[in-house]
Curated annotation (Swiss-Prot):
Keyword presence, Nucleotide-binding: yes
CDD domains found in the cross-reference section: PRTases_typeI (cd06223)
Enzyme class: transferase
Residues annotated for Mg(2+) binding in this entry: 133
UniProtKB keywords: ATP-binding, Cytoplasm, Kinase, Magnesium, Metal-binding, Nucleotide biosynthesis, Nucleotide-binding, Transferase
Domain of life, source organism: Bacteria
Gene designation per UniProt: prs2
Catalyzed reactions: D-ribose 5-phosphate + ATP = 5-phospho-alpha-D-ribose 1-diphosphate + AMP + H(+)
Pathway the protein contributes to: Metabolic intermediate biosynthesis; 5-phospho-alpha-D-ribose 1-diphosphate biosynthesis; 5-phospho-alpha-D-ribose 1-diphosphate from D-ribose 5-phosphate (route I): step 1/1
UniProt protein name: Putative ribose-phosphate pyrophosphokinase 2
Gene3D superfamilies: 3.40.50.2020
Binding residues annotated for ATP, in chain numbering: 40-42, 99-100
Length: 319
């Protein structure tokens, strides 16, 4: 077993709360650093203890303000490189820019690949992240990437609440999220349904359901909850089609301005999200947070001890 004395964890400014929980799960205190922003917007990071020869883990979600948090991360990585860290591992509970993972129209940038290149060029040796928007983003990096899944966490939550079986239906509010919905449905032994829209429905007012939600408890699942519009529209559709109760779950709760008000005006009973993102905006009254810190902490320990991370990808239900 590798000695955790060779490991150091550092938290930047995006999500101090989850960083503290991750440190507790790993059993290693957070290292000392200072990070400040000058009046002109420049960021300065100072590591206040030696990292020479250590395996360094830097915890930072690149959430709002995305560019500040990304730049702070890059500066910290450079500081670790120049301070002779043995390895630099970046822990991204939420990876901003991952949605820009394809060229959808002419002359459009591939920004997820650009950010990957920046991190690798800065000196990152490994990425540990949580529920990438698209798993193929892993291929944008020329270094190892461990992409942890939140569905097992959600499955445990719903199983503990008794939300499983044929009385439940897992609904993907868009056709691109079918795989995610199917994964949760398999844990819950529940059917799935998909909300789709006609190709010419620019205002998204004519959504229809593929599958059956009538008389069932519907669980809407998406990876990123940003404005709340997707869940708001989907909740109206499943309610119209006869769902008896509506739940919503998302890996990353960004909750931009106005999202809480929009979601508070729906009949969604509970909105379940992880603590991957710390937001200063108002959150919905019925939001429920579950922590991903133990999952991430377990992954860090396994990486450091040269053990496989794959056992963390599943939740074993009690028979």
């Amino acid at each position: 077993m590798s000695d955790r004395k060779n490991m150091k964890l550092f938290a930047l400014n995006s999500n101090q709360e989850i960083a503290q929980k991750i440190a507790q799960a790993v059993g290693v205190p957070l290292g000392k650093l200072s990070s400040r922003q000058f009046s002109d917007g420049e960021i300065q990071v100072n590591i206040e203890e030696s990292v020479r020869g250590y395996d360094v883990y830097i915890i930072q979600s690149t959430s709002f303000p995305v560019n500040n948090h990304l730049m702070e991360l890059l500066i910290m990585v450079d500081a670790c490189v120049r301070a002779s860290a043995h390895s630099i591992n970046v822990v991204l509970p939420y990876f901003g820019y991952a949605r820009q993972d394809r060229i959808a129209c002419p002359r459009e940038p591939l920004t997820a690949k650009l950010v990957a290149n920046m991190l690798v060029k800065a000196g990152v040796d490994r990425i540990l992240t949580l529920d990438l928007h698209a798993v193929q983003v892993q291929g944008f990096f020329d270094i190892p990437v461990d992409n942890l899944f939140t569905v097992p966490l959600f499955a445990k939550h719903y199983c503990d609440k008794g939300l499983l079986g044929s009385d439940v239906v897992v609904v993907s509010p868009k056709n691109s999220g079918v795989k995610r919905a199917r994964s949760l449905a398999e844990y819950l032994d529940a059917p799935i349904a998909i909300i789709d829209y006609p190709q010419d429905d620019a205002t998204r007012n004519e959504g229809y359901i593929i599958g059956d939600v009538e008389g069932k408890k519907a669980i809407l699942i998406d990876d990123i909850l940003n404005t709340g519009r997707t869940f708001s529209e989907a909740s109206k559709i499943v309610e119209r089609e006869g769902a008896t109760e509506i739940y919503a779950v998302s890996s990353h709760g960004l909750f931009v301005e106005g999202a809480a008000e929009l979601l508070d005006n729906t009949n969604i009973k509970e909105i379940l999200v992880t603590d991957s993102v710390a937001t200063k905006e108002k959150t919905p009254k019925n939001v429920c947070y579950i922590t991903a810190s133990e999952l991430i902490g377990d992954a860090i320990v396994r990486i450091h001890e040269r053990k496989p991370v794959s056992p963390l990808f599943a939740y074993n239900k009690k028979k």
